[in-house]
Amino acid sequence: MNFNAHFELRDKHAFLSPSSPYWTEYDDQKLIDSYKNYQAREKGTRLHAFAAEAISLGEKLQGHSRTLSMYVNDSIQNKMQPEQTLYYSEKCYGHADAIQFRRNTLSIYDLKTGLVVPGKMRQLEVYAALFCLEYCIDPHDINIELRIYQFDQAVCYEPDPDDIEELMQDKIVRFDKILKMVDEEE
């Protein structure tokens, strides 16, 4: 039999995918709610790509959502680097929405486009810990500014360097060693 190729669908997954059949247990309302969340995530992915391109080009925004415009315009004004990968190991890395390290200050901005759940600073603290590990910087020797852009506002936070160091050593480094031991056992 000659099966249909569907080249355009390679490396993609349908919402009603056989590989994640949880949806077969949904009622109609749960299906609709789940699909709306999926659509919001897809839109968020596209908005992040759009914002990264605008920042890279230095194109300030007007006429878009207040949250998106604030995030892009602040990132441009503060010379942030969009979509930067922060790497500790194959088991622990992430992609910061916007980051800058100048004048001994680490700034990390995060754009949240979701509808319901407020963003958490813990994610940005992990990015700060990854930055310090990757570039061999003691968090006590720098200033750290974290910002979440969501719900038409920017929430700013300066984490305690001890919290960042604890994340670095007690979580990232220790957990990475544990996972390496698990890999070696197999």
PLM feature spans:
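Accessory terminal regions of nucleic-acid processing enzymes
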Residues: D176-E186
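Mg2+/Mn2+-dependent nuclease catalytic core
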Residues: Q84-K177
